[in-house]
Amino acid sequence: MFQDNPLLAQLKQQLHSQTPRAEGVVKATEKGFGFLEVDAQKSYFIPPPQMKKVMHGDRIVAVIHTEKERESAEPEELIEPFLTRFVGKVQGKNDRLSIVPDHPLLKDAIPCRAARGVQHEFKEGDWAVAEMRRHPLKGDRSFYADLTQYITFADDHFVPWWVTLARHNLEKEAPNGVATEMLDEGLERQDLTALNFVTIDSASTEDMDDALYAEELADGRLQLTVAIADPTAWIAEGSKLDNTAKIRAFTNYLPGFNIPMLPRELSDDLCSLRANEVRPALACRMIIAADGTIDDDIAFFAATIESKAKLAYDNVSDWLENNGTWQPDNEGIAQQIRLLHRICLSRSEWRHHHALVFKDRPDYRFVLGEKGEVLDIVAEPRRIANRIVEESMIAANLCAARVLRDKLGFGIYNVHTGFDPANADALAALLKTHGLHVDAEEVLTLEGFCKLRRELDAQPSGFLDSRIRRFQSFAEISTEPGPHFGLGLEAYATWTSPIRKYGDMINHRLLKAVIKGEAIARPQEDITQQMAERRRLNRMAERDVGDWLYARFLNDKAGTNTRFAAEIIDVSRGGMRVRLVDNGAIAFIPAPFLHAVRDALVCSQENGTVQIKGETVYKVTDVIDVTIAEVRMETRSIIARPAA
């Protein structure tokens, strides 16, 4: 009787449209209940029974109920699930398998089975890739997933690497493929094999991209020739190897090992500028004045070179600092080091006055045993030899940026526009409260940005610098020439690492067209998106493996009185994040560890400060002593507390 009643349907429709609803993201807690976060200000309580229909991170629409003046959300419609493809640990065996996602806020096991075509017989503790197939808000009775890929077994020592690479869907090994002979590119190569080119790298480096040669001219100016490995002499555009490199976009450097962009035969041998081996190269010759200015007369050309020495950063630095026992093999090599050192000092001085110089931060190197165990973590400060190479590469990339801009009008450029214009007024207001007066318009120009950066570098601490970082825009990869505010340069195009960066290979092909005087098509925009995405994934993978190894390394320090110096890098409502100075590990100090009385404590992300009873006790960039309270291996998180 009521089945097709239009009045009833209308009433239902009316009730539905009058019921308040909200769209937001589900935030789970460890207590079983959750919240629907609509925006930064508004959230609704989700009771435990309703949480069974959703997962942390799901974007949903929920019906809002009000009972006794208390609002709660009942999930109704799934807009976007948090989990689609994920990695996790398998539980159970035979026909009753489930998988626990590897995520700090997802604790519930999801029933699953091996997908069609997956041969592996899964057992307890296995790591796997899974894809969600069912969701309660899609009309299914429960969550359900398919296991689409076996990663590794529970006790594999290399779990951090294999799981991380699978999580980000990145390659595990070097690409296959060989390049049997060099291409005929119609390039005349200058024979520079007699010159004393040298490479300076880490002692363990096999993929040597760059070799340097310097000489003093009659007028006292210095001439620098930068020779770069030439993979595009072996790899034709559009070939299988080229397409593989295009997809990978970069060599992926992880603690302990790398996954190259090119086959190892090329990256570590045929293209690598090995000592006493004749190699094809793309070269740039520039003349540098005493004040570090690069002359307009820049020459790019194809060459054949033979590196005369594989030098290591530490040896060269020790020798220049008159330390240690290492000596260059002969006077010719010694003279090269001295000239390159002079170039480094004059270029560094030039950049100091006319561009920007980064503050030196140490690199942290994991020393690993045979089974992936962390034997030590070594802070490697950037020494004078690192700076010699850095200054030479920046100079060479600046030359390429100019030549590509002037001759073609395009290339693969690293572009950074400084501050987001939408933030200029807020930035000026913040600086004013700290006694720095900047013009909101001027600070958006390259010159204004450089001026501000120099003022910030002159401050007694990096506190103010850390406060304005949130106003900065991100660096981008673009085919259009544009300024790089972070370096303080009018344009910057890298071509000095073609073995490990696909964008540099593209710039090689463009520079070769310039050398030959040929027309060449502008690179497609989609390649810049692929490179940006790969760079993001590789960085996340490096961070994830690092977190795992730090947790392993510091696990036995939990609960002990071992003190670590730690720099405060961020303050949030829940506490503060610190970086351990000696090894680079990131740890979290929860607010209750800062002060027992919550009402007397104010942790302000906005100001980067922690106040107790109205007085600032901690601020970002402060260095404090901490001890390790706890290491949570399942989430790879390190909890610290201020040392008593």
Swiss-Prot record:
Q: What is its EC number?
A: 3.1.13.1
Q: What is its main location?
A: cytoplasm
Q: Name one GO biological process term.
A: mRNA catabolic process
Q: Which PROSITE patterns match?
A: RIBONUCLEASE_II (PS01175)
Q: Gene3D superfamilies in the record, alphabetically?
A: 2.40.50.640, Nucleic acid-binding proteins (2.40.50.140)
**Residues of the RNB domain:** 189-516
Q: Which UniProt keywords apply?
A: Cytoplasm, Exonuclease, Hydrolase, Nuclease, RNA-binding
Q: Name the catalysed reactions.
A: Exonucleolytic cleavage in the 3'- to 5'-direction to yield nucleoside 5'-phosphates
The terms under GO molecular function for this entry are: exoribonuclease II activity; RNA binding
Which Pfam family, any one, appears in the UniProt record? Answer: RNB
User: Gene Ontology cellular component?
Assistant: cytosol
Record's InterPro entries? CSD, NA-bd_OB-fold, RNase_B_OB_dom, RNase_II, RNase_II/R, RNase_II/R_CS, RNase_II/RNase_R, RNR_Ribonuclease
> Start and end of every S1 motif domain?
561-643
SMART domains given in the database record: CSP, RNB
Where does the protein end up? Cytoplasm
Q: Which family does it belong to?
A: Belongs to the RNR ribonuclease family. RNase II subfamily.
Q: What does this protein do?
A: Involved in mRNA degradation. Hydrolyzes single-stranded polyribonucleotides processively in the 3' to 5' direction.
Q: In its UniProt entry, what is this protein called?
A: Exoribonuclease 2
**Organism, per UniProt?**
Salmonella paratyphi C (strain RKS4594)
